[in-house]
Amino acid sequence: MENISVLTNNNMSVKNLNPYNNNDEEKQNSDVLNQERNSTNDLFSSFYEKFNDIFLFIEDTTKNNNCLEDEVDDNLIKTLYNLCELFLNYMKNINDFANFKISQQDQELIIHSYENFVRQCKEYNDKPKVKQLENEISNLLDLLFNNTSEAVNTLFSADSFFMDHVENLKLKMSEKNQKIQFENERLKKLELEKQVEQFDESFEANKKKNNEMDETINKLKKDINKLNEKIEKYDNFMKMKRKEIDIDFSDTLDCKERIKLLENCIKTTERNMKTTQLAPLKIVENCADYIIFEFMTTRNLMRFKVSNYESDNVHIEINPYEENILAYINKNVKKCKDISEISYLIKEAIYLNFLDL
């Protein structure tokens, strides 16, 4: 006997939902069944064919036998029994369709097949000759089996019965889809809450780092302010010292006169602090191409190499290198007439550098 129990396989696709083999496609009853409309891939095709077969069989039996109660054919009993049990199995499992794990497209195919079957069942109930057989079949089933009236009544009210089930099935599938959608939204909400929590943790960590950076920046600002205060004090001190010295170099003064003016204007204490003792330049090496002067300070020993001093292309090197001193010498060396004036210029640059003038 065939039944629909195989439909409970949740992973089965709609194309595999029909477990029956349709071997009766050559049934000839064009006034009742249109085979072109009833596709063999339809979910209810097997049941529909059996539904048709039983009516044809009963109709034929009624025409050829005056009393069904006296002569009960074994094939009739078997066919009726199989039909009723198959029908009840459909009814028992039809609501399980809504619990299948199938796609939205597959659900729509099931609904379409279901509604098509309802229309086909309704055709039977609309035919007067089928109505005339209803009581005879009911009596026959009551004679053969106990408690079958409910199945028969259901069988012959298939249009309204199945229509209710179609709506129930749609409702259940809709509820299931809404539940799935709700669950997806809930999972999405949990994921978003997790991300928010991670962002909050990251924000707190960054906030802590920002606070630490703010403290460091504030400390650096305080240190910078202290240094600025020291620099400002030093600048004010040097401005005051420069006012005390107040040297006015006239453009007419030569190097020797400027050096003398410097030495006269610098106080003895300032001289000792800033320029050591204004030690004279010493010639430590004298060649045809260059002369090396040496100047001793409290901090280091400075050497000045003067090359090409008898030409217009005088070149001077300082060791250790002092940018300010060399810049001042190169700026004024063209004014010097001989090596003597160059030596005074070097000493003048040294004094001015040490005095920050």
Swiss-Prot record:
Record keywords: Coiled coil, Merozoite
Superkingdom field: Eukaryota
Practical application: Possible candidate for an effective malaria vaccine as determined by epitope response in sera.
Stretches assigned to coiled coil: 166-244
Protein's name according to its UniProt entry: Uncharacterized protein PF3D7_1446700
Organism: Plasmodium falciparum (isolate 3D7)
